[in-house]
UniProtKB/Swiss-Prot annotation:
Protein name as it appears in the record: Tubulin-like protein CetZ5
InterPro entries: CetZ, CetZ_C, FtsZ/CetZ, Tubulin/FtsZ-like_C, Tubulin/FtsZ_GTPase_sf, Tubulin_CS, Tubulin_FtsZ_GTPase
Family matches, as CDD domains: CetZ_tubulin-like
Keyword terms: Cell shape, Cytoplasm, GTP-binding, Nucleotide-binding
GO molecular function: GTP binding; GTPase activity
Taxonomic lineage of the native organism: Archaea, Methanobacteriati, Methanobacteriota, Stenosarchaea group, Halobacteria
Family matches, as Pfam families: CetZ_C, Tubulin
């Protein structure tokens, strides 16, 4: 699946950079072009792999390249004002070769939170391809303001995109971990899942073709209808002697290695499917609230047992209660792992999303009460120095 990628704000740009790095490392080819936007020039300079000419600073006349802080309303206003400048990011891009457009953004801060929905709206107005958001939710300890920003931005992004891939920082943060290292680790978790999803329909360098291909239409159909999705992934390392060669001790001793390998393959694949869904989702949720699903099993071709792939697909069907769960395999001849990726589309119940919304509502109520209180205080202070019995000087 070919994607044209946009990174909005600091977090969005960093995740985009991480995806490009992962694509290079895995010798894949699914990103047709990459564009980064920011209101802070320093954040654009900090990127490594997004081409220099594709790093676009906007809102400079208002904030002079220093960013908007956590003011996502200002970011949205600047993005709307500079919308033509944002769209120039697609001028040199091979848009016709892209199956979909992807917008990365941290939803708790300012620039990404406010400007990502604006960019999505304008791309939707011009292009036929589906527009997907990748929304990074703040952890609970990042504060009420970030939750308020995230709740408003997530709602806006869902409204103007064809689907939103959600990633919950709070679910993946390790206590005591260095902040920069934590973000790098979480970015890697996210881009590995997206990279496998997008690469799974491509023909491998070895020329090996999947028995059940997961092409772009399968992904697009899983995401149709809008909403929020979550992605799980789990992998099992193969024994060193089996890492792609199909060698086994039982075969060496004259036994039937194929039956042993088949049983091992089935066990590994079904176990990793359960792990992916029950503990490795980018956004923890009620699995039975998903409307659709997609299962992709990757690894050396001889380990991709059709029976196991079908069992895994059926199990996800049972867990979600959906009859729209697709399945396929992604052969990787040089891999020493068997991995399972599970995409759950249109998830309607997530405790973390509900918590963010609740915190946001409370923060908004507190904000309005403070505004009303400040206005009353100003009025009281004015009465102390103003006497209506005196004529105005002007």
């Amino acid at each position: 699946m070919k994607v044209l990628c946009f990174g909005m704000g600091q977090a969005g740009g960093n995740v985009l950079d991480a995806l490009l790095r992962y694509e290079q490392r895995t010798n894949a080819d699914y990103v047709v072009d990459a564009v980064a936007y920011n209101t802070a020039s320093a954040d654009l300079r900090g990127l490594d792999l997004v081409p220099e000419e594709n790093r676009i600073l906007f809102g400079a006349d208002e904030v002079s390249g220093h960013g908007v802080g956590a003011d996502n309303e200002l970011a949205a206003e600047l993005a709307e004002r500079d919308s033509r400048q944002l769209l120039r990011g697609t001028d040199g891009a091979p848009t016709s070769t892209a199956d979909a457009f992807l917008i990365f953004a941290g939803l708790g801060g300012g620039t990404g939170s406010g400007a990502a929905p604006v960019l999505a709206k304008h791309l939707n107005r011009i292009y036929e391809q589906p527009i997907y958001g990748v929304g990074i939710l703040p952890a609970a300890d990042e504060g009420a303001l970030y939750s308020r920003n995230a709740a408003r931005s997530l709602k806006a992004l869902v409204d103007v995109t064809d689907h939103v891939f959600a990633f919950d920082n709070g679910a993946w943060a390790e206590s005591g971990e260095d902040v920069a290292q934590a973000h790098d680790t979480m970015n890697e978790v996210l881009v590995r899942r997206l990279g496998i999803l997008f690469a799974s329909g491509e023909v491998a360098e070895s020329g090996t073709v999947a028995e059940s291909v997961v092409d772009s239409s399968e992904v697009i159909n899983t995401l149709r209808g809008g909403g929020i999705s979550t992605i799980g992934y789990a992998a099992s390392e193969l024994p060193e002697s089996d890492g792609g060669g199909g060698f086994s001790i039982k075969g060496l001793l004259g036994g039937d290695s194929s039956s042993t390998d088949e049983l091992d393959s089935i066990n590994r694949i079904t176990t990793q499917t359960r792990k992916a869904v029950l503990g490795q989702l980018t956004l923890p949720c009620d699995v039975d609230s998903a409307s659709r699903g997609l299962v992709v099993v990757s690894g050396p071709p001889e380990w991709l047992n059709r029976k196991a792939v079908e069992r895994s697909r059926t199990w996800v069907e049972e867990q979600t209660g959906s009859m729209e769960v697709r399945g396929g395999d992604y052969p990787l001849s040089e891999s020493n792992h068997v991995g399972v990726l599970v995409l759950l589309g249109d998830v309607s119940r997530s405790d973390r999303v509900a918590e963010i919304r609740s915190t946001a509502v409370e923060a908004e109520q507190n904000r309005r009460e403070r505004i009303a209180s400040d206005a009353a205080d100003r009025e009281d202070g004015t009465e102390a120095v103003v006497d209506d019995r005196l004529d105005s000087l002007f």
